[in-house]
Design a protein with these regions (language model features):
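Secretory-pathway glycoprotein ectodomains that are cysteine- and/or Ser/Thr/Pro-rich
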Residues: 1-162
């Protein structure tokens, strides 16, 4: 006999920010820069994560250069900024693999939360990033430990190809 117990809480039901998030496009060539546009009618704190085709997650923001991402009311924010490291992706390095489907996950809150506790920051190289990445199940478990009713979560899928 298997018994399951769960606490089910709808996301954003107690004041999750009305965040608008979108990628510059839905399809990218390998290593082509990815841009994320964010906008909210209220002051919003944001964490941004990359969810790879291998089901591994790393944190893009906040990071060493940008300790806090805040969207001011009614103002649009484009990331990364010109002076920040670019966000890029490529298909998994498996022989014959020409494309993958991945996603950027945006977690928004009306107040600061410990975004760094959800996943480690992307590294300075692919090898370093892969060693830091954690399985999607661990990321989502850590995310659920926060009050999901006060969060807004946007999943921005894209296709990356050679």
């Amino acid at each position: 006999v298997v018994r399951l117990r769960a606490r089910v809480t709808p996301v954003g039901t107690k004041g999750g920010p009305a965040l608008s998030a979108r990628l510059s496009k839905s399809e990218y060539k390998a290593n082509e820069p990815i841009q994320i546009e964010l906008e909210s009618p209220t002051r919003t704190y944001v964490g941004i994560y990359a969810w790879g085709a291998d089901n591994m997650v790393v944190r893009l923001y906040p990071n060493e250069a940008t300790s806090l991402v805040v969207i001011e009311p009614g103002k649009s924010r484009l990331l990364p900024r010109p002076y920040e490291a670019q966000i890029a992706s490529m298909p998994m390095p498996i022989e014959g693999n020409m494309e993958d489907h991945e996603a950027i996950i945006v977690v928004a809150s009306p107040m600061p939360i410990k975004f760094a506790s959800l996943a480690g920051a992307a590294g300075k190289s692919l090898a370093q990033t892969m060693s830091i990445a954690l399985p999607g199940t661990k990321f989502f478990s850590a995310l659920a430990a926060n009050d999901p009713s006060r969060l807004t979560i946007r999943v921005l899928p894209y296709r990356v190809h050679q």
